Amino acid sequence: MLKSRIKYNTASFVTSAPDITKLPADTGIEVAFAGRSNAGKSSALNALTDQKLARTSKTPGRTQLINTFELADVDDMRLIDLPGYGFAKVPIEMKKKWQKSLGEYLQKRQSLKGIVILMDIRHPLKDLDRDLINWAISSEIPVLALLTKADKFKQGPRQSQVLKVRRELSALDGDITVHAFSSLKGTGLPDVAKKLDEWFLGPVVAVPPAEKILNDDTNPTS
């Protein structure tokens, strides 16, 4: 079982919205999942929540709406599945519509407190990925970059690719964390849960052990 402060398996579907006007009230905290149409975004959400929460399709580009999922064990906190971007075979008008919905959400949604950007580990940091990361940095939104389909690489090449992406993104001077991820093998899943816990609930503060107070009976004066 996934160890986390929030029970992500309590997530449930709320609504699918064509634009931000149809989303739930802009209150509380939202964490959005975004990525290219073939990056494995829906599979990552399903792995995190341990259920078939987000629809997966063998045809990239099928997610056309902003899908909202509510976390049952915490108040006013949501996971957002944003439309996939960058799939070449999508009709141009549909692509423009998706880009408009995505742009409106990212620019105007006040409850957005973190964004998970998923990229195929074999082809990371495409132009649209970089655009999204740069937007997040300029808006002071923290980013968790997941290099998906990590099971396609052995451990050595996988780690080399992670380090390469970390080096590139470190030059951007933003709050960016990079991990390898595989929804098939569960690689990186604890890292995702830990980061989302921080965004939703705040970082874990280490509490120093209470000082031992000695009273006159246990520490008599001479």
From Swiss-Prot:
Its cofactor is Mg(2+). Necessary for normal cell division and for the maintenance of normal septation. InterPro entries: G_ENGB_dom, GTP-bd, GTP-bd_ribosome_bio_YsxC, P-loop_NTPase. GO terms for cellular component: cytosol. The gene is engB. The lineage of its organism: Bacteria, Pseudomonadati, Pseudomonadota, Gammaproteobacteria, Alteromonadales. This is Probable GTP-binding protein EngB. It comes from the Bacteria. One of its GO terms (biological process) is division septum assembly. GO terms for molecular function: GTP binding; metal ion binding. GTP binds at residues 35-42, 61-65, 81-84, 148-151, 181-183. Residues 27-202 form the EngB-type G domain.
